[in-house]
From Swiss-Prot:
SUPFAM superfamilies: RmlC-like cupins. HAMAP family: IolB. One of its GO terms (biological process) is inositol catabolic process. Involved in the isomerization of 5-deoxy-glucuronate (5DG) to 5-dehydro-2-deoxy-D-gluconate (DKG or 2-deoxy-5-keto-D-gluconate). The lineage of its organism: Bacteria, Bacillati, Bacillota, Bacilli, Bacillales. It is an enzyme of class 5 (isomerase). It comes from the Bacteria. This is 5-deoxy-glucuronate isomerase. InterPro entries: Deoxy-glucuronate_isom_IolB (IPR024203), IolB_Bacilli (IPR023770), KduI/IolB_isomerase (IPR021120), RmlC-like_jellyroll (IPR014710), RmlC_Cupin_sf (IPR011051).
Amino acid sequence: MSQLLRKPERAEISKGVTLVHDVTADNASLEYVSFKALDLSQGATYSETLENKECCIVVVTGKVHVTDHEVTFENIGTRESVFEKKPTDSVYVSNNQTFSIEAVTGARVALCYAPSKNQLPTKLIKAEDNGVEHRGKGNNQRMVHNILPDSDPSANSLLVVEVFTESGNWSSYPPHKHDRDLLPEESLLEETYYHEVNPKQGFVFQRVYTDDRSLDETMTVENENMVIVPKGYHPVGVPEGYASYYLNVMAGPKRIWKFFNDPAHEWIIE
């Protein structure tokens, strides 16, 4: 199996808490981005102390309480399925803080991490504060929920976004990349994709490739799989009859999202 494609682990790490994914610098070719997905049974609690990283807690589904033991946000989360296609609540927690998550209902949460040195306030990112965009045209259309865009100064390194792509469409397309620290033309950002597919027996295709093809992998990505993008272009194709959701986490040396389209395919938007 590709080193870029990750299947769910589903390991119970404490009572009522199941680790679905755990992407770290130790098990992935990433320097800036880390990611966990957790399933919590109703009433279960998960706690973690951050050291040199910040974290964005995304309530993917269900309802939870989140606290940093100074500030508490209760009953956050807005949906039972991501395919309700409405924004959800998230919480930003800075480095050197401890946070706890208690499940009010059965819940899935995503923990998105990036390096951080400067402490910032814990912040509730309300669903209604997500910027919603509709991008593309033709069979290249998708809806975007901006949870932590680069225009929001709430984080030091993290960029977090949800993308919904309908049946028969492409996203992250035309193929683009952000793997060179070459501003203003391009920024260097690693990225992870957490995928869901509806109906759940479906799949999408994702290709990750570089100009010189030293990296060139095309993957069949199933429901709840992850794809790691250390560098290169990374388009996603959604077959007829299925809908795609993915949660993107990006981070790099500068908190700016500036991508570069593959010149061979940029003509489709000209």
